[in-house]
């Protein structure tokens, strides 16, 4: 607020105090940081699909997905009557707002909104059951002004391939996931099948890294313009620099090498757009162990012992 008041821009603002709720997102200060939750939306989703809030003696569900879904053209028809599209859209808003650990599970059920089958319905119910057991949780933000932009990017190479569905081209596609952080706070998450079919793990990882940096470079430009207009909008770390974390050595080598290699010249030029930012030092590509790769949570269904630590590192619980 003070930054805008001290600027030379003609912006009229009113101070209405601390922000406690916005678009159904509740915000609360805790000893851990700023907690963002959507209890009303979660309750609405559970009521829509008919999931009881009482777990009873049933075991706690610790992950929102257990497998990769397919088209399942010959599968059984849906049994329940709730609106599949409506529920998936609510889940999508939840995942993109305060529950980014759901992003893989929600993304894959969203692929089958036109003709969902019983297997897809069961996957949605799995997400909702997981939400029942974690309905009071959200995203905890712990700002750190010493950190600028950071990107965690990961890909699952042809993770949906299945010999029973080999005729479906989508099973050969890899999945991209990336998380963009600013000041140690998650500001954007993305999980989606890649549009092209990658020919190797390295290519899938490089495409993912390129897509992630395309998004963050736009944000970097915006913050640079904002800092130029508002003198007091300054941070210890330059706003127009970014550190990207990647766990594939081949993708790192391609990203940090100035010239194209014979083995990688087939990769579309659109995926090399960020190299000049690397060469000028605006973007740094850093190696990270797979166990610490936060984006892994959005590429595939994970077992609890892998999922839970990544969730804690990503959103604080």
Q: Which positions does each model-derived feature cover?
A:
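Polymerase palm active-site segment centered on the conserved acidic dipeptide of motif C
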Residues: 1-42, 47-49, 132-134, 142, ...
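Divalent metal-binding acidic/histidine catalytic loops
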Residues: 39-317
């Amino acid at each position: 607020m003070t930054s805008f008041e001290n600027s030379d821009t003609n912006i009229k603002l009113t101070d209405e105090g601390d922000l406690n709720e916005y678009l159904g997102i509740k915000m609360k200060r805790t000893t851990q940081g700023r907690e963002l939750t959507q209890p009303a939306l979660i309750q609405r989703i559970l009521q829509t699909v008919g999931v009881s809030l009482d777990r009873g003696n049933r075991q706690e569900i610790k992950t929102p997905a257990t497998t990769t879904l397919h088209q399942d053209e010959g599968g059984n028809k849906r049994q329940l009557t709730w609106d599949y599209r409506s529920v998936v859209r609510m889940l999508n808003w939840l995942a993109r707002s305060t529950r980014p650990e759901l992003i893989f599970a929600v993304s894959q059920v969203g692929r089958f909104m036109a003709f969902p089958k019983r297997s897809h319905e069961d996957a949605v119910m799995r997400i909702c059951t997981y939400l029942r057991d974690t309905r009071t949780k959200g995203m905890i933000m712990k700002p750190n002004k010493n950190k600028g932009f950071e990107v965690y990017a990961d890909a699952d190479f042809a993770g949906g391939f299945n010999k029973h569905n080999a005729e479906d081209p989508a099973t050969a596609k890899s999945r991209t996931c990336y998380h963009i952080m600013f000041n140690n706070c998650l500001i954007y998450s993305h999980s989606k099948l890649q549009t092209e079919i990658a020919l190797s793990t390295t290519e899938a990882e490089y495409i993912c890294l390129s897509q992630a940096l395309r998004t963050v470079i736009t944000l970097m430009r915006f913050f640079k313009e904002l800092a130029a207009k508002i003198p007091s909008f300054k941070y210890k770390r330059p706003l127009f620099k970014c550190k990207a974390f990647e766990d594939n050595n081949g993708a790192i080598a391609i990203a940090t090498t100035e010239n194209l290699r014979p083995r990688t010249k087939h990769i579309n030029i659109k995926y090399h757009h960020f190299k000049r930012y690397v060469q000028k030092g605006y973007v740094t590509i850093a190696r990270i162990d797979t166990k610490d790769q936060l984006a892994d949570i959005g590429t595939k269904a994970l077992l609890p012992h892998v999922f839970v630590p990544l969730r804690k590192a990503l959103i604080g619980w």
